[in-house]
């Protein structure tokens, strides 16, 4: 399949058109360095944050690309983190992308591969909670209920969809690990 690399302001402005440009398209990747240059962002740290910006200056671009990917069935992949001597910086950048719903991140150095696998793999506790959510909702459904309570919180169909995503990702990872 085809993958698109979104790395300019014009590319981001046309991200939806890019997402729908071919039936062979499978994924989109965020090219943060060229995107930063295109935005004239004041940074020289590829994929890192500028300490003078209050938050994550890449959030808007990452979010826009994620929405286009998910709306049209593509896999979103975050771009590089240039300082391969900063594993914590890589982990933080990857964590922000994973929290948004990205499925992976470029590793430009062998030291980043295990970090990426760790960040984008749901922790065992998260998988277990997701399974508990699905079980509680299945039990509620047998009683004709569309919602339930788990650990003092309301869960419903949206909770089930989020939990299914976690379990599905874990299933893929576990299957690949066994291969």
Where are these regions (language model features)?
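Expand to "…catalyze enediolate/carbanion chemistry for C-C bond making/breaking, isomerization
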Residues: 1-179
């Amino acid at each position: 399949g085809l993958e698109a690399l979104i790395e300019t302001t014009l590319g981001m402005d046309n991200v939806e058109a890019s997402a729908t440009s071919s039936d062979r398209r499978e994924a989109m990747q965020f090219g943060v360095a060229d995107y930063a240059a295109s935005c004239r962002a004041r940074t020289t740290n590829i994929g890192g944050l500028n300490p003078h910006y209050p938050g994550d200056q890449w959030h808007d671009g990452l979010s826009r690309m994620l929405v286009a990917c998910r709306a049209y069935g593509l896999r979103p992949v975050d771009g590089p983190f240039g300082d391969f001597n900063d594993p914590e910086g890589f982990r933080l950048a990857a964590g922000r992308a994973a929290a948004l719903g990205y499925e992976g991140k470029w590793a430009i150095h062998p030291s980043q591969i295990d970090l990426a696998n760790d960040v984008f793999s749901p922790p065992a506790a998260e998988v277990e909670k997701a399974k508990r959510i699905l079980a509680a909702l299945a039990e509620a459904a047998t009683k004709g209920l569309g919602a339930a309570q788990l650990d003092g919180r309301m869960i419903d169909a949206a909770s089930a969809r989020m939990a299914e995503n976690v379990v599905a990702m874990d299933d893929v990872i576990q299957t690949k690990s066994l291969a």
